[in-house]
Amino acid sequence: QTWDKELEALAQSYAEKCIWDHNKERGRRGENLFAMAPTLELEFAVEDWNGEEKFYNLTTSTCVPGQMCGHYTQVVWSSTHQIGCGAHFCEKIDGLETEDMHLLVCNYYPPGNMKGKKPYMEGPSCEMCPMDTVCVNNLCGE
């Protein structure tokens, strides 16, 4: 994935609104939200989203009932190639009771979590990389 300044600007402007709900005006873009206090540790956000892997069944492309896994599937969605994130300190986040938190918003393009589709194909890493790419850390890259 590559960093995208437009997605960053969209995420930043939405984070500054301090709303704990998806941006309904984000168009055809994926989105993950994360809130944390007293400081924002990006590693915790990524660990939290990736931690949902245990609730996801790739074979059936479903989450364990009652659990969330959409953050994880968006992070690993193979056709998503752009990401941009923004963060803001909010005294109050609309939709959350805890006060004085940092809100992280990440937007993705193209979006993942498409109904009836899997986030990636099972198989050896990099086996399906396009011809003009290389395998770096078990991921297709330029």
Language model features with spans:
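Mature extracellular or exoplasmic CAP/SCP-family domains and secreted bioactive peptides
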Residues: 1-142
